[in-house]
Amino acid sequence: AGPAGLAAALVAAKSGAEVILADEDFNMGGRLNSERFSLNHQSGVDWALSTVLELQSFQNVRLMPRTTILGAFDHGIYGALERVSDHLLVPLAGKPRQILWQIYTKRSLLCAGATERPIAFENNDRPGIMLAGAMRSYANRWAVTPSQSVAIFTNNDDGHKTAIDLKALGVNIAGVVDIRLDAPDSDLYEVIAGGQVIDTNGRLGLTSITVSTPNGKTRCLTCGALGVSGGWNPNIHLTSHHRGRPVWNDDIAAFCPPIDGPAGLSVAGAALGSFTTTGALLSGAKQATEALEELGFKTKKAVLPEAEGTITKMTPFWYVEGCTRAWLDQQNDVTVKDVKLSHQENFVSVEHLKRYTTLGMATDQGKTSNMGGLAIMAELTGKTIPQVGTTIFRPPYTPTAIGAFAGRDRDEEFRPIRKTPSH
């Protein structure tokens, strides 16, 4: 429940409709909890908190934190997994670990945000290398930094946001390596425009990175952590649970929700490909208003906060050419070389690629790795990424304990003893 979800929930709450707002985080707000920009002259964190408090005041609203919508099923039914005691050191007596809810809806709105994707390069599995957005979240939300000297490798403006935020918190920025020749310059840190990270160094953790520059020379940047940003992918998984095929969007170089998604499901915010805060707020309020009016509810024009609306510029870039291993899927140890070998073995469809390499078959279902693999296969086959296509997703959206599916009919209630009339 980021800006789109909160804006949509507020519109729905004021209409009188029965509303359930589910968020997998314990603190609603989405990326607002990890950013430093303001809404209506207050921090994004404070705006999210005040909005949640307002939603709590409505009798027709049910807030469900620590709850993930894990599947979209027939007739507007959704499965929701509530984590009751996973976060507790000592679980509460008589409380389950997780609860599986079945939610029956007339209309639903997906505001699941987006997931940052990496760039593959040699030895990118060394401790200290992480996504730039995650690094920003640790710093802004938890006041934690992986190192006092950080470098950034990016193909988009969002990577620079991480450098700016870390610099403001007193972290030394060793440099921002931006693959774009027209990368924005900065007075706060050095920008290596047109550069690429070609190797990393360090025995027990990252100590430095090797960077190639446009003039053909190499440089070594000393750093204890490297933030990587290759762009963002909308979280569209639920929209494909009814076999809908994602649609490619050139503007963000990512797949967006299918036209033939689950009936009654609308999408807003970053999940729709709108990556600005202003765009997320507007799309959330708009989609909620349209859904409510279709159900016969009267709505008022949403009063939205002023927010930043700068579009993040990005140049698609998926991997750095090299000789040694560059990981795409770090959970299943799938490398760039594995995808190339798959092509050499004549496995050219995405379904064959997935099964030959196990790309995207880990518990995250390829949330960070699939796009890189598809881009490499497209390059090898001389096709575009939408021509190569993508596999679709299935429930559950996140790993779920088998016990949550057990239900209430167990033991004798599941298989009662049958007796003959003589008994």
Where are the language model's segments positioned?
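Residues forming the flavin
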Residues: 1-423
